[in-house]
A protein has these predicted regions:
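Phosphate-binding P-loop
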Residues: 2-8
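Hydrophobic anchor at the beta1->P-loop junction of P-loop NTPases
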Residues: 11-13
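The conserved Walker
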Residues: 17
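Walker A/P-loop
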Residues: 22
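Post-Walker A helix-loop "phosphate-sensing" segment adjacent to the P-loop in P-loop NTPases
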Residues: 29-39, 52-55
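ATP-dependent small-molecule kinase phosphotransfer cores
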Residues: 41-114, 121-125, 141, 145, ...
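Phosphate-binding beta-loop-alpha motif at adenosine-nucleotide cofactor sites
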Residues: 132, 184-201
Length: 220
């Protein structure tokens, strides 16, 4: 199915670290012509610059950064280090920082008719009225292996134990934080990626949900 010009589709994709949400969200965005945004990269971008520049006032510093942020700046391999991952969970607890990034994401979503944003609080906080809310789940060992393969492209010395530990800490912090914790939206569609045979199976499941929604909304 090809979406028509008048079709409006807003998708939220949430889940823990390396659960498959980024891959799934990117692939269905490409398939259906959706504007894609990773909220995780926004937080990593914020962490990277706070650690690099150590500003006196984090909030005013980040406001300026996000007022001029282009999505091309998010394509930075250094954003994916374990150090950045750990720091990201720390700043994610800060409501003022979350508000800056929330405003950026909402503004992004309002610019387009067809949007997919992935993260950890998209379906519950950023896009609570999304047409479709996907929630990705994955066994921690499998998720850690996925992340290890990704990280070893730039850091051959990193180990499975390090990655798994960092991911466990990250997920626990995200679930337990006071502000916008990682929780499954009530009406979310579960995508259990470790139970699916391959990426094609994941895309097929998501596509079926999307096309059924479009047919209900606009007719066959």
């Amino acid at each position: 199915m090809k979406l028509k010009k008048h079709h409006k589709l807003v998708i939220a994709a949430d889940g823990g670290a390396a659960s498959g949400k980024t891959t799934g969200a990117k692939l269905i965005s490409k398939k259906y012509g959706l504007q894609f945004l990773s909220s995780g990269l926004l937080y990593r971008f914020a962490s990277y610059h706070l650690l690099k520049y150590k500003p006196k006032n984090n909030i005013s510093f980040l406001k300026k950064k996000f007022n001029t942020l282009s999505l091309k700046k998010l394509n930075n391999k250094f954003l994916h280090s374990p150090k950045i991952s750990a720091h990201t969970s720390i700043i994610a607890k800060n409501q003022k920082i979350r508000n800056i990034l929330k405003a950026f994401q909402i503004k992004f979503a309002k610019k387009f008719n067809k949007v997919c944003i992935e993260g950890r609080d998209i379906g519950t906080v950023i896009l609570p009225k999304a047409d479709i809310k996907f929630f990705f789940k994955c066994n921690l060992n499998i998720a850690a292996k996925r992340r290890l393969t990704e990280l070893q492209k730039t850091n051959k010395r990193i180990t499975f134990v390090e990655v798994k530990k960092a991911m466990r800490i990250r997920n626990n912090l995200d679930k337990k934080r006071k502000n916008s914790p990682l929780i499954q939206a009530e009406n979310a569609v579960i995508v259990q990626t470790d139970k699916l045979k391959n990426i094609e199976g994941m895309v097929s499941k998501m596509s079926k949900t999307i096309e059924e929604r479009i047919k209900r909304k606009y007719g066959a």
